[in-house]
């Protein structure tokens, strides 16, 4: 098994899981992960060495998801947005959580999703490309902010 194949087998499930949680669409998540792997493969073919492939791939995935979410938000029809706001109370819990995550800043969303996936503070710092010392405080503030958003959306937390 070559280096690319072993990296693919190791990283694909993690990348897909993060992308699916961020964009809330299985097909789009698969497309994003595929696009990242194509780009990574092209880098390898051109002789460019990625020293920490897992961190690089996960960072590329979260960045691509943020770009997609920005695009989707910018190009979403206004009627769909108003329907979303009007029907919040009837949404499934996952839909409400997804809406709450969408209200966070891109970096905040990345950190919450990585944390929920079980990544350590050190791994979150590497993937999000931030200082290790700021992860705990930023994550704490973000989780508090998320809790407030969920409360505003009448999300019942256990």
Language-model features and meaning:
Residues 35-52, 72:
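Sigma70-family region 2
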Residues 59-78:
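Arg/Lys-rich amphipathic alpha helix in sigma70-family domain 2
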Residues 128-153:
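DNA-recognition helix of helix-turn-helix
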Residues 79-102:
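Acidic, proline/glycine-rich intrinsically disordered inter-domain spacer in sigma factors
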Residues 15, 19, 29-40, 57-60, ...:
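Short, small-hydrophobic-rich alpha-helical interface motif
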Residues 111-112:
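A short pre-motif secondary-structure segment
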Residues 102, 106-107, 117-137:
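Helix-turn-helix DNA-binding module
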């Amino acid at each position: 098994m070559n280096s690319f194949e072993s990296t693919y087998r190791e990283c694909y499930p993690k990348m897909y899981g993060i992308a699916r949680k961020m964009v809330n669409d299985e097909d789009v998540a698969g497309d994003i992960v595929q696009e990242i792997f194509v780009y990574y493969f092209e880098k390898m073919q051109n002789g460019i060495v990625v020293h920490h492939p897992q961190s690089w791939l996960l960072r590329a995935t979260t960045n691509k998801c943020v770009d997609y979410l920005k695009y989707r938000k910018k190009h979403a029809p206004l009627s769909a947005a108003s329907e979303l706001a009007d029907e919040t109370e009837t949404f499934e819990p996952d839909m409400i959580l997804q809406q709450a995550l969408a209200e966070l800043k891109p970096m905040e969303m990345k950190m919450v999703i990585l944390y929920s996936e079980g990544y350590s503070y050190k791994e979150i710092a590497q993937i999000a490309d931030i200082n290790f010392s700021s992860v705990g405080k930023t994550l704490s503030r973000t989780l508090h902010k998320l809790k407030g958003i969920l409360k505003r959306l009448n999300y019942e937390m256990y």
